Design a protein with these regions (language model features):
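N-terminal pre-domains immediately preceding structured catalytic cores
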Residues: 2-3, 7-8, 13, 20-175
Length: 175
């Protein structure tokens, strides 16, 4: 065989031999939903939200809002489990929320009397008493941070100059 024939045979055999090997799957890069990307905040890395948790109705969304609340208001519908942040243009950003057992009892209006970034958290005495398996180790409090159940922000609701003990806060549960 000539040199050219050998090179041509080798060139034609390489793809055939490659087909005999194991197939290597290309891993798809996970899709990140805009607005839910990884964020670095005060030195804490908050991972991107897995798209499987962002099912319909679970993503923040700008929606028409005509209930008449003042721009800047935060309106919580505890039964629909939605929070609305009212804008000036007749819209609101709607968020899916969780509502604690006690949260259902909040009625009327309040105002944000305090805001905290990376708030500390202490379970109530009742939480420690009724569920020591979950809360006893945190009875002395848990400093703000990536493992704190309040998440990165908390709004403390007041009424008549007093803390109502109701909070609007983030979570470390990304489900």
């Amino acid at each position: 065989m000539t040199s050219l024939a050998l090179r041509l045979a080798a060139f034609l055999l390489i793809p055939a031999l490659a087909a005999c090997g194991p197939r290597v799957e290309q891993a798809e890069a996970p899709t990140v939903v805009p607005g839910y990307e990884e964020v670095v905040d005060a030195g804490y890395v908050i991972p991107a939200v897995d798209p499987k948790h962002l099912i319909e109705g679970n993503q923040k969304e700008v929606v028409p809002y005509t209930a008449g609340d003042a721009p800047g208001s935060i309106v919580v519908d505890v039964y629909a489990r939605k929070l609305y942040w009212v804008h000036e243009d007749g819209t609101a950003t709607r968020y899916a929320i969780a509502v604690g057992r006690e949260g259902i009892s909040f009625r009327g209006t309040g105002y944000v009397g305090r805001k905290a970034e990376w708030p500390s958290w202490t379970p109530t005495a009742n939480m420690v008493r009724t569920r020591p398996d979950l809360y006893a180790e945190y009875a002395g409090g848990l400093p703000g941070g990536i493992d704190n159940p309040l998440g990165a922000r908390a709004l403390y609701l007041y009424r008549g100059g007093r803390d109502t003990m109701f909070r609007i806060h983030g979570t470390i549960d990304n489900a």
